[in-house]
Amino acid sequence: MQKYLPVLRNCPFFTGLTDDEILSILHCVSAAKITRPRGSYIFRAGDSTEVMGLMLSGSALVIQEDLWGHRNILSKCNTGDFFGEPYAATPGAILNISVVAEEDCEILLLNVKRLLTACPTACDHHQKLIRNLVSVLANKILLFNDKITHVSKRTTREKLLSYLSAESIRQSSLSFDIPFDRQQLADFLCVERAAMSVELSKLQKEGLLVTKRNHFELLTR
């Protein structure tokens, strides 16, 4: 696990912990590294899990799918991001999301049950980790609240403007990149890609924004 310390140091889950403490925690919670190729499932809806995942390299999409293949993207996980925490922390909970590798990736699996029970070595840093987990979960709630705000808008135009405005504020810039390609953005906002493309063209003609691929620049009048 030594080679992954640069990633783990920058992960909010390990904030305030030394390298030795991080390695001790990984042993305590029976951390295991797995690899998954692009397009494969890491977690699948309908299953249950006792572990949460941490992206060591690559990226993955957290999605919901129906029986006809319609996809709703909930979030994107990049290096250092977690997924599956609420389900792993709730005994018997059935996943209503799937996590799919967007590219070849390495994932660290952490047993949440071991994290939430008394540490056999009574380590002081175990309590820090629990506090960090609460913070990570709270931040994820805020992110999902933002998504609800965007998709609750009535029109495709309103959804786009809501999302792009929020991204501009989050990144403190009128010029920014988003983590999605066009199809993924449509799936994230729960709109049809063709309709979204039409609205983006209108917004550019109206002088509200300039966009190329996943880069956007918002224009103020």
Predicted regions, residues:
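Cyclic nucleotide-binding regulatory module and flanking cytosolic helices
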Residues: 1-38, 87-90
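Short, small/polar residue-rich loop motifs at catalytic or cofactor-binding pockets
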Residues: 28-29, 47-49
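Short phosphate-coordinating micro-motif centered on Lys-Gly-acidic
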Residues: 41-47
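Cyclic-nucleotide recognition modules
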Residues: 73-131
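Phosphate-/nucleic-acid-contacting segments
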Residues: 154-221
